Amino acid sequence: MKVRNLLLLLAFCCLSLAVQAQFVSTSAHPKREFRAAWIQAVNGQFRGIPTDRLKQILINQLNSLQGAGINAVIFQVRPEADALYASQYEPWSRFLTGVQGKAPEPYWDPMQFMIEECHKRSMEFHAWINPYRVKTSLKNELSPIHIYNSHPEWFVTYGDQLYFDPALPESRNHICKVITDIVSRYDVDAIHMDDYFYPYPIKGKDFPDDASFARYGGGFSNKADWRRSNVNILIQKIHETVRGLKPWVKFGVSPFGIYRNQSSDPLGSATNGLQNYDDLYADVLL
């Protein structure tokens, strides 16, 4: 009898542990996981490569990512107010063909190709855009059809680079027009933004937006709060643009790694580096 009772007790304990383990396993993991990888264009890995070879390179990358369990790909399609797709508003990217405005030969649409290949592998496709950046070096030549040539007043030079002025409604409207074009014509799963903040600061040089602040800064006692507001407005407008077109399409943002240092804010991190809030004018906690 004692042996029988002992066996029943052991069986009950094993069953209880199994149920508990199942509960812990289920509760510790979300229903859906986001396991993403970035594929960038600005390192020159695509430039000037023949179409068939580049397609095979991308297929090999996707196969490798699929084998690693990746379920979403964030693919750079607009690095410098240009396009790695058949844009209605901006020129072909130099990071694809070597010359801005030059279409690929033989013709193909890298974004459409990547959407189809990602979906074949049950991966999400996130169209990655850089909103403000136009030139990483003033030596870089712009295509004759680039929007800068029609509206140079929308842009500012900071250091050796060219940017959309984040304060201007015209800048935001153009960026949203580009996103409208992408979301309307392509089966993207998400729009993803990188470098959505003001440019990284250059020592001894303030971002040249005094004229814009004089025109649009009413109601703000200091320029820093106004700049953060400009970034917030763009984020809100893009969110509304995407949701208004296809509510199921996601919208994501990649901020810089430090919100604020604890030396600036108790809510900050134990870091001592560049800060989103103070240096890049992005309030990432909103």
Task: Annotate each PLM feature.
Residues 32, 36, 70-81, 109-156, ...:
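Glycine-rich, aromatic-flanked loop segments that form ligand/cofactor-binding clefts
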Residues 1-8:
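Bacterial N-terminal signal peptides that target proteins for export
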Residues 32-34, 40, 44-56, 116, ...:
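Active-site-adjacent "subsite" loops/lids of carbohydrate-active enzymes
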Residues 170-286:
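Active-site neighborhood of glycoside hydrolase catalytic domains
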Residues 42-52, 92-108, 157-176, 218-231, ...:
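The substrate-binding groove and active-site-proximal loops of carbohydrate-active enzymes
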Residues 11-20:
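Hydrophobic h-region of N-terminal signal peptides that target proteins for export
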Residues 83-98, 133-159, 195-219, 266-274:
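Aromatic- and acidic-residue-enriched segments that line the glycan-binding/catalytic groove
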Residues 56-83, 185-190:
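Catalytic domains of carbohydrate-active enzymes, especially glycoside hydrolases
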